[in-house]
């Protein structure tokens, strides 16, 4: 099994309950069962015709060289491989649970016991689950949650579903997957094209949601940047206005001289007591007074 099938993103398994292709009503189931029975009858008739063709005697055999015979064999083998899918009705089975750490090659080997498997698709676990398991010290191997397998013959798909569903894988007792229980369901009326169409549809929806989230994030970022720039511009305008006001106040301010008001004094006898100033006595008078006392 190539890696490309296991790495492709798949739709969530919870949405399969709403999918009318996988789960149908009673009337739809009757129609599907009748359709399957008709396909089985057609397939059985084709197989009977092939057996009759093989049993017919080869009366018209032409003598050919060994090289020509070998080329004819190769041509018939290629034609048989290309026509095998068109001759037989394919059948698809759904695996709701894949044993832990089982690789697609191992699962293909198990399913091949019941018939030839054409295509196999397994859905990987989500990345955050894998990282959480590894971070907590768990196994680093890749796990698959669910899958789909397409058998070349529809009867092989039915046999696989009826045999493996609810039973252990078995095999040798020492096998790592001996006791793992398989959950397999045959999907009547379901073809591989339906699966790929739904996967493409789910991928388109996921991509549209992603684009919408990206556009919303870009819009929020642009609005945030615009608000930041506007805030800076408003702050600069306020600072400039404040600076201009301070400069205008300094220019308009008048220069005023201040004078110290002296106390009014008078030596006149008629002056009031609050303004009267006593004259200092002479030095000679002070000396005489000092000598007397």
Swiss-Prot record:
Residues 234-243 have a biased composition (Basic residues). It comes from the Eukaryota. Residues 7-19, 36-58 have a biased composition (Acidic residues). The keyword Nucleus applies. One of its GO terms (cellular component) is nucleolus. Residues 267-284 have a biased composition (Polar residues). GO terms for molecular function: RNA binding. InterPro entries: ABT1/Esf2, ABT1/ESF2_RRM, Nucleotide-bd_a/b_plait_sf, RBD_domain_sf. Residues 91-181 form the RRM domain. SUPFAM superfamilies: RNA-binding domain, RBD. Residues 1-68, 234-286 are annotated as: Disordered. It is found in: Nucleus, Nucleolus. Keywords: Nucleus, Ribosome biogenesis, RNA-binding, rRNA processing. The keyword Nucleus applies. GO terms for biological process: endonucleolytic cleavage in 5'-ETS of tricistronic rRNA transcript (SSU-rRNA, 5.8S rRNA, LSU-rRNA); endonucleolytic cleavage in ITS1 to separate SSU-rRNA from 5.8S rRNA and LSU-rRNA from tricistronic rRNA transcript (SSU-rRNA, 5.8S rRNA, LSU-rRNA); endonucleolytic cleavage to generate mature 5'-end of SSU-rRNA from (SSU-rRNA, 5.8S rRNA, LSU-rRNA); small-subunit processome assembly. Belongs to the ESF2/ABP1 family. Involved in the small subunit (SSU) processome assembly and function, and in the 18S rRNA synthesis. Required for the early cleavages at sites A0, A1 and A2. This is Pre-rRNA-processing protein ESF2. It comes from Kluyveromyces lactis (strain ATCC 8585 / CBS 2359 / DSM 70799 / NBRC 1267 / NRRL Y-1140 / WM37) (Yeast).
